[in-house]
């Protein structure tokens, strides 16, 4: 079920990959981080699984971008 939902939001992950650079991250790392982020989002908001609107995209995009920006800040501080 998680993998099916991830396929729906995978485009957001790949767009972020093109916009941001994280040292030593490969495509698989981005996908893994995206799945982990989606899992955490659905744990916090299980109602998003049943919703028919596209609210999950908005929530995921915000959560994932913030996660990537945190990783970039961490990378830059080292």
Tell me what each language-model feature is:
Residues 1-77:
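Alpha-helical promoter-recognition and RNA polymerase-docking modules of transcription initiation factors
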């Amino acid at each position: 079920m998680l993998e099916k939902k991830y396929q729906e939001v995978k485009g957001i992950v790949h767009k972020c990959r093109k916009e941001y650079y994280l040292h030593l991250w490969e495509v698989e790392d981005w996908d893994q981080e995206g799945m982990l982020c989606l899992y955490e989002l659905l744990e916090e908001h299980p109602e998003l699984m049943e919703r028919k609107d596209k609210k999950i995209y908005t929530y995921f995009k915000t959560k994932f971008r913030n996660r990537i920006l945190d990783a970039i800040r961490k990378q830059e501080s080292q």
